[in-house]
Design a protein with these regions (language model features):
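Conserved histidines in hydrophobic membrane contexts and catalytic metal-binding motifs
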Residues: 2-479
Length: 479
């Protein structure tokens, strides 16, 4: 009787052991791909958190001003910029957030070069320029988003972030205690049990405790990705133009086109929506239509001072003001957490004004956002460390923790790998009777929810079946 009752227990123990090692193998192979990207994202993200501080340190002489009682009208500052840079088009005005910092005007030329012109608001004098292409933030943001190789880099990062969620789910399964051995290290750091146990405790407990934080960063980051972000969730959360725009005519210009370089200046849920057009142009103006980037402004258009007054009457304080880019273009005033204009996403606002009459064409606020758009608006503020100094410091701590989790994972593998052997040192593989249904369902859900990660998993499984298991040297090296 004892022997017969022991058989099911042994079989169940064998099944659980097989599942554990299978999960560990998935965790291991996903980690091989994800860890380099996790290190890159954490390092570049840490630098981007201090964009304002780095920029002020690099360009202190250009940006610093001495506060005075009277300010020069913004229209006069704009005219000074136009005269100083006749081959450039002024595209944006950003008022200084503090009294001792210069106002900024963004300018672009026909070749696409983009500069920031710093203007003393008290004297109206140009203090200097900042080349957007020379910005440390722009460089870090481009690496963070595309690895400097465009769409290919974007896709690789999206695969890494998607597999990062698989890494997280499998890691949680491995972390939850199931026997005395796993309970011994649960929520404990054992410093006296050797380097491998120490690395394991740091890796598992940090990863487990910060799993929700990591998931938040992965999801909010994926929302910018080219497939899951732009083609799926962003497309479904972009405003249908008829909802807010009504019968107002649309241009071919989207809100995303208003961004400068790698900077995300417009709200995420508006990026794919078209910008409305100005239609209140007086009939007597017979000026020829001009190309967007060559547009120098219409004599009948309202001055920038008029638009600023209207924006302030709506409640705008910190904001970016985008100038019309054609005779049918509009003045756009945007204050949003994604662009770093404000820290409270509930105060997000984007307003479009007819450049001739000043009529408010579109006014989009937090209340108009979808549920996921609200998550993005709030999430991006936290993601970028814009809410407070504490938020910024906390994000640095999180980045350092993610780096430590990645490094301890590599060290664990290095310690346990077979020495003097041409093998990868993957966790052992055990035969299993039947299919682990919960694991299969979880994997299918992740593949469907994050298609780039799913595509990568399908390719790996195909290679494993077609090549790795058929070539003995590869089979030995990878197992």
């Amino acid at each position: 009787m004892l022997r017969n009752s022991a058989k099911p227990q042994l079989k169940e123990a064998s099944r659980l052991k097989s599942i554990y090692f299978m999960t560990w193998r998935w965790h291991f192979y996903a980690g091989l791909f994800v860890i380099p990207f996790m290190l890159m994202l954490s390092l570049t993200g840490s630098v981007m958190l201090f964009d304002d501080e780095i920029e002020l340190a690099r360009y202190e002489a250009t940006l610093q001003v001495s506060p005075q009682e009277q300010m020069v009208p913004v229209s006069a500052q704009l005219e000074t910029v136009k005269q100083a840079y006749p081959d450039f088009n002024v595209t944006q005005f950003v008022p200084a957030k503090t009294a001792d910092i210069a106002n900024r005007f963004s300018i672009q030329n026909q070749e696409g070069s983009s500069l920031i012109v710093a203007v003393n608001p008290y004297t109206g004098n140009v203090q200097g320029t900042i080349d957007r292409g020379d910005s440390i933030y722009e460089l870090m943001n481009s690496i963070h988003g595309t690895l400097l190789i465009g769409d290919l880099g974007d896709r690789l990062i999206e695969i890494a972030a998607s597999l990062g969620i698989l890494l997280l789910v499998s890691g949680l399964y491995l972390w939850v205690p199931r026997d005395n051995a796993s309970r011994a290290g649960f929520l404990k750091i054992r410093f006296n049990n050797g380097p491998r146990i120490l690395m394991r405790d740091l890796h598992a407990n940090l990863g487990g405790v910060l799993s929700i934080v990591l998931l938040f960063f992965l999801i909010s980051g994926l929302s910018w990705a080219g497939i899951w972000g732009a083609k799926m969730v962003q497309a479904w959360n972009t405003f249908p133009t008829y909802y807010t725009w009504g019968e107002k005519p649309e241009s071919t210009l989207t809100h995303k086109d208003l961004n400068h370089g790698a900077s995300e200046e417009m709200p995420w849920n508006l990026e794919l929506a078209a910008v409305p057009e100005s239609k209140d142009k007086p009939a007597h103006d017979h000026a020829n239509m001009k190309e967007e980037m060559a547009y120098a402004g219409s004599h009948d258009a309202l001055s920038i001072d008029d638009i600023i007054l209207k924006a302030e009457m709506l409640g705008f304080t910190g904001y970016k003001l985008f100038l019309p880019r054609s005779e049918t273009g509009v003045y756009t005033v945007a204050a949003n957490s994604m662009g770093g204009d404000i820290s409270d996403p509930r105060q997000d606002r984007t307003s479009h004004f007819d450049q001739y009459s000043g009529r408010l064409l579109v006014d989009v606020t937090w209340q108009d956002y979808s549920l996921f758009a609200k998550f993005m608006a709030a999430g991006v503020s936290l993601h970028q460390g814009d809410v407070s100094v504490f938020n910024k410091v906390l994000n640095v701590v999180f980045c350092l923790a993610f780096i430590l989790i990645s490094i301890t994972g590599v060290v664990m593998w290095w310690i346990r790998r077979p020495s003097r052997s041409a093998t990868l040192g993957a966790p052992p593989k055990f035969q299993q009777d039947g299919i682990w249904k919960l694991g299969l369902v979880t994997l299918v859900i992740l593949c469907l929810a994050f298609p780039m990660g799913g595509l990568a998993i399908v390719k790996v499984l195909a290679l494993d079946w077609l090549l790795f298991n058929r070539v003995e040297k590869l089979k030995t090296a990878l197992n």
